[in-house]
Amino acid sequence: MATVRASLRGALLLLLAVAGVAEVAGGLAPGSAGALCCNHSKDNQMCRDVCEQIFSSKSESRLKHLLQRAPDYCPETMVEIWNCMNSSLPGVFKKSDGWVGLGCCELAIALECRQACKQASSKNDISKVCRKEYENALFSCISRNEMGSVCCSYAGHHTNCREYCQAIFRTDSSPGPSQIKAVENYCASISPQLIHCVNNYTQSYPMRNPTDSLYCCDRAEDHACQNACKRILMSKKTEMEIVDGLIEGCKTQPLPQDPLWQCFLESSQSVHPGVTVHPPPSTGLDGAKLHCCSKANTSTCRELCTKLYSMSWGNTQSWQEFDRFCEYNPVEVSMLTCLADVREPCQLGCRNLTYCTNFNNRPTELFRSCNAQSDQGAMNDMKLWEKGSIKMPFINIPVLDIKKCQPEMWKAIACSLQIKPCHSKSRGSIICKSDCVEILKKCGDQNKFPEDHTAESICELLSPTDDLKNCIPLDTYLRPSTLGNIVEEVTHPCNPNPCPANELCEVNRKGCPSGDPCLPYFCVQGCKLGEASDFIVRQGTLIQVPSSAGEVGCYKICSCGQSGLLENCMEMHCIDLQKSCIVGGKRKSHGTSFSIDCNVCSCFAGNLVCSTRLCLSEHSSEDDRRTFTGLPCNCADQFVPVCGQNGRTYPSACIARCVGLQDHQFEFGSCMSKDPCNPNPCQKNQRCIPKPQVCLTTFDKFGCSQYECVPRQLACDQVQDPVCDTDHMEHNNLCTLYQRGKSLSYKGPCQPFCRATEPVCGHNGETYSSVCAAYSDRVAVDYYGDCQAVGVLSEHSSVAECASVKCPSLLAAGCKPIIPPGACCPLCAGMLRVLFDKEKLDTIAKVTNKKPITVLEILQKIRMHVSVPQCDVFGYFSIESEIVILIIPVDHYPKALQIEACNKEAEKIESLINSDSPTLASHVPLSALIISQVQVSSSVPSAGVRARPSCHSLLLPLSLGLALHLLWTYN
């Protein structure tokens, strides 16, 4: 029954997502189908509200979002409402004859997969044999045909209409004009919905996308022909238009010996009609997974991995060898975790599972594969195990009757293996060794164990650790979540992913304009990192990928172009990863992290990179302890700020000199107090606009100008990018503000609580004119008033520096706060202290646009990896030369669950940095981040922790929440 309900609900979601649905204007009319359905939920007001929104929605994207969220409010046990919603829509129950994926089987690359496909009756039947990571064409075809079959169900009992419709979706080539015309002739009078549904697919049919052949343009010998070719493929749709355009643009007739036309002919004569044959892309078949190959500990696995993901498909033997020697080898945990990050990144939250229900309602836990397919997979695994044997790639484990012996434990194991909970720090997903040993001792058929094997030896192969930082204790999932159904405090708009396969989901931090309803996420165009890659990056971004041949330490930087392809790739100098560092007479290999006193260090290609904290040790004398300030070079805690050429304000000249600045490279006064446009450095036809920035690249090479020169325009564009001036007047954009002779206060709409220009001190030691001005610079506020103290850097520091500062009270419940380095006041947040390789940043800047790389760029990139809208990213460059990243709850009164979510996001990002995961390292300039230390606001049983009170104790948290919600779109 549960399966039926799930399939009905799935059909409804699928149907409404792909086909136009007649929508009701305004509310639901009494007696309408929608009203009758929603009456089934009269005892559940939240479900009723969602139901009414579904039937009255006028936006297809809004409808899709509501349907994805509906199971949260209308559980599957409400059979009547789900049956009613399905039955109120035509075509849902009709099942097509045969499996629609049958016509796709010839697209399978591996012979075993092709055979399994021909014998299958559903996608589930091939999931064990066919690998999604390199059978992209097959799975895309199946998914498209499954969705297309919904269109044909609108034909009802009209045989001719149904057959012509099915002919479109059962072919593995692009449907021709005659096929589409036949559907229109036979179906137009029967079902307009069917015609609309078919048109949606035929107009966007992906298998014959002209841009897939852009690489052919590079074969043209004439530069003008190359440009014409690219322009034509980007703008023309039909083959006739493209051929005519190429003849005209290249001034040549189609000749088989011409490299350009030869390339087009080869792609059109593919062995699989309709599937464009690409040359090996410049990124390899999968640039993200290729990044992981260098993490292999054995040369065998490194070579196999490189063979599989570089320039040519690995054969079946290569895959089998990789499975046998590498896929389950504990020695290769670093490479395997990296590959898992690419295939299935750890994401916060799990819900809506019907079998693995103990995994539901866990909004602050990380999972790799919390979805319906994995839920079904766990149930299927249990059925197989009930036959008395657990088949692993390298060993078969005989077991007793698991229906009678610890069934709940076995279910937790099956679900853990499929849903894959992962640690925020290690990102490991294996169960703990003690659980493995316990279950095999109780329920393993030990008389039939393979020769020389015991429960302990088998578990040594499967789950070699009991370290709770690296394994999952099953006890967690033997009972439901204690949170029940209270999940709205923390939401996950992009999990599960609501976007099409070629688009990237981003959290909507803009809010809704003028209070109108809108989606909590955006789907943005992106590029895949190779032909076989599912790893998508945002259009317009710079990406670092390994060289396509897979040489260790060799990378290139590419841009994600408008065509959806990586382009303009530039080779970087190879890094010698064999170089080691000598520390205290001991050799440290590349990538090794370790501590020296209170400092954290990392060896990066032979260079030792360490934090520059001043340390006290157990051997420090009493005089040392008495004079210890905790500041760099033990400088006095005097606050006489100076502005460095890198755009950073330092508390004193002593500290500026200590971090390496010469006397001519800083001047007295804070950077914010300087006017970079006086005297005017721009030409007469240009306007000077202040642009404060803190630069991480070498100043002498790339500069760090605090202004930009923009052309003076007679008429400004009407683009909506609101800014607020110093008189608290709002303007459409910067151009209109300066055209009216005003001065910028901050970016974003004017906020009522920032009308009074009361200064605030940011965590970076800079005084801002208002809370809003600080937030628009991605800097969180430490306290109200001008900056007046150096702040606390060490647990051994004196708190006398902050004695005169009045800190706001903490209004968060159950939080043991942290104090960011250089700040005075406590904060409930997750904090990262990150070291970076300055040489790598300089190399990136040199290879790309020759411009300096700033702290703001780093923060904006990190922000894209925080998936919970209830948390946002702020940060600064500390006086100890670390990038400090703060992940802060944005609600006015953050709940303990929200603080925990921000902590988990911080721990996740720390792990991705420390492991050099392609999830982050593929993004320029995040690839220069080397090592991170995390500190989180731990939970305490009391209702809250309060700092020293002040008259601003209520105002600052309220301002924080409001400003974050309203300003985050503009920064």
From Swiss-Prot:
- Show which residues constitute the signal peptide: 1-22
Please tell me in which tissues this protein is expressed. Answer: Expressed in various tissues and untransformed cells. It is undetectable in tumor-derived cell lines and oncogenically transformed cells.
Q: Keyword set for this entry? A: Cell membrane, Disulfide bond, Glycoprotein, GPI-anchor, Lipoprotein, Membrane, Protease inhibitor, Repeat, Serine protease inhibitor, Signal, Tumor suppressor, Wnt signaling pathway
Asked if Ubl conjugation is a keyword of the record, the answer is: no
Knot repeat windows: 37-84, 104-141, 151-197, 216-263, 292-338
How this chain sits in the membrane, per its record, is:
Lipid-anchor; GPI-anchor
Query: What does the UniProt entry say about where the protein is found?
Result: Cell membrane
Modification after translation, per record: N-glycosylated.
| Entry-listed glycosylation sites | N39, N86, N200, N297, N352
* Lipidation positions, renumbered (GPI-anchor amidated serine): S942
Question: What residues make up the propeptide removed on maturation?
Answer: 943-971
Q: Which Gene3D superfamilies match?
A: 3.30.60.30
Citing just one GO molecular function, the answer is:
Wnt-protein binding
Q: List the disulfide bonds.
A: C633-C658, C635-C654, C643-C671, C716-C735, C724-C750, C761-C787
Q: What is its main location?
A: membrane
* Subunit note: Interacts (via knot repeats) with WNT7A (via disordered linker region); the interaction is direct. Interacts (via knot repeats) with WNT7B (via disordered linker region); the interaction is direct. Interacts with ADGRA2; the interaction is direct. Interacts with MMP9.
This protein is called Reversion-inducing cysteine-rich protein with Kazal motifs
Per UniProt, what is the name of the gene that codes for the protein in this document? RECK
